[in-house]
A protein has these predicted regions:
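N-terminal subdomain of nucleotide-sugar transferases
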Residues: 1-66, 181, 238-246, 329
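Conserved donor-binding/catalytic core segment of Leloir-type glycosyltransferases
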Residues: 5-7, 183, 216-243, 253
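Membrane-proximal helix-turn-helix segments that form the acceptor-binding/catalytic region
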Residues: 35-37, 103, 124-127, 131-135, ...
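A charged, aromatic-enriched C-terminal amphipathic alpha-helix characteristic of glycosyltransferases
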Residues: 44, 363-394
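Donor nucleotide-sugar binding/catalytic pocket of nucleotide-sugar-dependent glycosyltransferases
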Residues: 162-165, 169-213, 275
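Acidic donor-binding loop of glycosyltransferase active sites
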Residues: 180, 289-307, 322
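Nucleotide-activated donor-binding/catalytic signature segment of Leloir-type glycosyltransferases, i.e.
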Residues: 262-289, 294
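Conserved acidic donor-binding segment of nucleotide-sugar-dependent glycosyltransferases
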Residues: 339-349, 357-363
């Protein structure tokens, strides 16, 4: 039998504890993508699957309230890997804990053909699996949603952080030769990260049309909605500035956490057009999305990293039969151009003009735009189709 171990940082989608313990954004996008991949792998019936998770959370005390992380809710689906959540020591603890778990899994199943998928370019995962792979025969596939050198761009980072990050990247590069194949979110990522020219596939994200929520917009207000990271670097204040020029009777609903929160709260106090709702659970977040008239992502295309990332928020939005308004980033394939609506300027007045033009359309016109958007996503980016690309890449790669 072919056995597959999925090593990631997932947690139950509706976990309330992770919100309770977190002091910043919860990694809902990463969590949703992992569960989409897991669902696709499970339904393929190609492997006997084991799930283990060293949960992706911020370090104690600044970003997370727990020093020792074990689990969040009892789960018969996930083996949680405990780790010590102190800065710097955290990654060392995660490495040894993951290595022990993987070694035991390999020993238990050594009579079978073994595959391991690791989610994210996380050095403790890569090093731990590579060390075990040195001593046994297994196929190692790495999913890379973000390049490590472009992570934490929104945070204010110290010289010490950059020093340790450079060491981390050198260690990671050393062990990448043990990876048999990759999944990247954009083709450009391979050119930057795939230094040993291994096989790869590109999966920018996926949607699950089975996700159902009730709309929170009981009054049928005209809502422009953004849910996600709240950093000036990612264009949120530009969007808020645009609202002062919007003539339509609409409201901008914002959910999330980040460095711009205090400014957003202040602007929401000064304007009844801005409605800040704080940090929400995944289900609460998608309920707000489903209540939107138009969904918006204000992230701009003025940084190098946009070539090496895909805005998963856009694909998440595309589930809801709503128009999606965004900037065309370098990492967005051209096939999306037929269904996404793009800002052509970062100028708040120009942004307001496009927002107004959308909200002046009839409900039927907006519904038709949304229908085409969701139809495209369901047909081309559903979790089964996207996961099949990963499975094909793995199975067509020999050790």
């Amino acid at each position: 039998m072919d056995r597959l171990l999925f090593v990631g940082g997932m947690f139950p989608k509706n976990s309330k504890k992770i919100i309770e313990y977190s002091k910043g954004n919860v990694q809902n996008a990463a969590n949703v993508l992992q569960w989409g991949i897991i669902k696709g792998l499970t339904e393929s019936e190609r492997f006997d699957i084991t799930l283990c998770s060293a949960v992706f959370v911020g370090s104690w005390f600044k970003l997370f309230r727990k020093l020792f992380v074990k689990d969040f809710e009892e789960s018969d689906k996930i083996d949680y890997i405990p780790f010590f959540n102190f800065p710097i020591i955290k990654n060392i603890s995660r490495y040894f804990a993951v290595k022990k778990y993987v070694r035991n899994w390999v020993e238990k199943n050594k009579a079978d053909k073994l595959y391991i998928i690791a989610y994210s370019a996380h050095t403790p995962f890569i090093k731990a699996i590579s060390k075990i792979k040195n001593k046994t025969e297994l196929n190692f596939h790495l999913i890379v949603p973000d390049l490590p050198q472009y992570m934490n761009l929104a945070s204010k980072t110290s010289i010490l952080y950059h020093f340790f990050k450079s060491i981390d990247l050198r260690i990671q590069n050393k062990y990448l030769k043990q990876v048999d194949s990759f999944t990247f979110l954009t083709d450009m990522m391979s050119k930057k990260y795939n230094i040993y020219n291994k096989s790869y596939t590109v999966v920018e994200g996926m949607i699950d049309k089975d996700n159902k929520v009730k709309s929170t917009n009981l009054q049928q207000e005209k809502l422009l909605v953004y849910t996600g990271t709240l950093e000036e670097k990612y264009g949120i204040m530009n969007l808020i500035d645009a609202m002062q020029y919007v003539k339509s009777d609409i409201k901008l609903v914002i959910c999330g956490m980040g460095g711009a929160v205090n400014k957003i709260k202040e602007r929401s106090r000064l304007s009844n057009k801005i409605d800040y709702r704080g940090i929400l659970s995944y289900n609460e977040s998608i309920a707000v999305q489903s209540s939107a008239t138009v969904l918006v992502n204000p992230r701009t295309n003025n940084e190098e990293y946009t070539k090496y990332s895909f805005p998963s928020k856009n694909l998440e939005y595309m589930m809801w039969n709503k128009p999606v308004l965004a900037f065309k980033l370098d990492g967005i394939p051209d096939e999306y151009d037929e269904v996404l609506i793009y800002f052509d300027s970062e100028n708040p007045m120009d942004m307001a003009e496009l927002i107004d033009s959308l909200f002046q359309k009839t409900d039927e016109e907006l519904q038709e735009i949304g229908r085409k958007t969701t139809e495209f996503a369901i047909k081309n980016k559903n979790y089964k189709k996207q996961t099949e690309k990963i499975i094909s890449c793995i199975c067509n790669t020999t050790n």
